[in-house]
Structures are given as structure tokens and as C-alpha cells.
């Protein structure tokens, strides 16, 4: 993604994980074949489901060990745009995240013709860093200014003096407290559906589509304009 070969995790040969689409009233049955050399799990973010299907290892289920298969099975009792991701270690940060879409039933009293039946485009926004997730985690614990320096958002002593906040800067540094920022981590690339850009060439001017957007980022906030 950023010009360097790095370790990542693909599911069904892709990053992000495949979009999963259901309709309210369905029963989801998802087979997870773990071909990694480590344990894994999948968490269904924001879904109403039986606790044992929630996907938190060593809390609601045992970890899915390497070389084994686990089946998640739960009823779809809601509609909306959600996402799913690994809940094991830092696997989410290197590829294990994806879109989870639940469509409204056509006989639902709130079904909107011309909206709920539009062609759907799942979009997952995320980020990529060439640093290993463990190193990112370590640097955050060290409370260094490295990521702020990379983003160009550090405040110099001269700037603190001009703002009348020199004592505040000294005090915060003494407490190893980082300066406030929108996001703590610098990323080399921001991705849309696992790519630097995404073209929807199947549509033409005048077509209507429904974008189902999920933030699959580890620590980024996204502001979209249309």
C-alpha cells in the first residue's frame, strides 16, 4: 500500500474481509477456517446476537486455534450498516475488518421504495501504516511525539511562548502527556475498500446508488464530502 512489502492478513484472499450481506429475518451461518499460525476470532460490531456468538476470545468463546474451523450462527434481527473485525491481538490493524450489511425486509412497514431498494455499494474506510502494530502500540505507550512530528502537528517551545502556554507545555511534558490531536497515529495511506482509490465504473451519470459506509480504521476519523 505504501511502497513497501509488509506482513498483512487476508481473508478469502482479500483486504478488507469480504462484505457480508443479509436480510432481516435471515439466520447468519459463517464458517471461519483459520489458516493462520496463530489463534483468531471475529466480532460482529453493533449486532444484537446471542452472547456466545459475540466473538470475544476467552470471554464469550474459546479462541479459534490455528488449523481449526469455527461456525458462527445467529439470527439477523435488525437492519443497518455495521462492520466486523478480529478481536484477537492486533489482527484488525493489518487486514481483518470488513463490512456487515443487513437489509430491511420488503414487507417492513418502514421500507422506503426508491431508497431501501437502490443498488448498494459497501464502502470500508481504513488506514495503513508500514509500522508493525506492536510497534505502534509501544510508541503510544512511550508517549513520544514521533507521530505528531510525522504529521507536522507538534508545538514548538517558541509557539508555546507565543500562545502564552509555555508553562502548560513544560507541565505536560513533565507528565509525559501528549499534546491534543485529532488522531494519535500517523498513517502512510488511507484506504477505501482496501485500495488507494475506488472507481465505480458500473454506474453512469444520473444513476442512484446507496453507499453503505463503515469506518474500519484503527484510530482515524473520516470526514466525507460529496
Regions of interest found by a model, annotated:
Residues 1-226:
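Histidine-centered copper-binding motifs that mark active-site loops
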Amino acid at each position: 500500500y505504501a511502497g513497501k512489502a509488509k506482513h498483512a492478513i487476508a481473508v478469502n484472499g482479500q483486504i478488507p474481509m469480504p462484505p457480508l450481506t443479509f436480510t432481516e429475518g435471515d439466520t447468519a451461518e459463517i464458517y471461519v477456517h483459520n489458516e493462520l499460525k496463530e489463534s483468531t476470532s471475529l466480532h460482529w460490531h453493533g449486532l444484537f446476537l446471542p452472547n456466545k456468538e459475540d466473538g470475544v476470545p476467552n470471554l464469550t468463546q474459546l479462541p479459534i486455534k490455528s488449523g481449526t474451523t469455527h461456525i458462527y450462527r445467529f439470527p439477523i434481527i435488525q437492519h443497518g450498516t455495521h462492520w466486523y473485525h478480529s478481536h484477537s491481538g492486533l489482527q484488525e490493524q493489518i487486514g481483518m475488518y470488513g463490512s456487515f450489511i443487513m437489509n430491511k425486509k420488503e414487507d417492513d412497514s418502514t421500507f422506503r421504495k426508491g431508497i431501501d431498494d437502490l443498488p448498494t455499494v459497501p464502502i470500508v474506510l481504513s488506514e495503513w501504516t508500514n509500522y508493525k502494530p506492536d510497534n505502534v502500540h509501544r510508541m503510544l505507550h512511550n508517549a513520544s511525539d514521533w507521530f505528531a512530528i510525522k504529521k507536522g502537528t507538534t508545538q514548538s517551545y517558541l509557539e508555546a511562548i507565543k500562545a502564552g502556554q509555555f508553562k502548560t507545555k513544560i507541565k505536560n511534558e513533565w507528565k509525559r502527556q501528549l499534546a491534543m490531536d485529532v488522531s494519535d497515529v500517523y498513517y502512510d495511506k488511507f484506504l477505501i475498500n482496501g485500495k488507494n482509490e475506488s472507481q465505480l465504473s458500473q454506474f453512469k451519470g444520473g444513476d442512484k446508488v446507496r453507499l453503505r459506509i463503515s469506518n474500519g480504521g484503527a484510530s482515524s476519523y473520516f470526514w466525507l464530502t460529496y
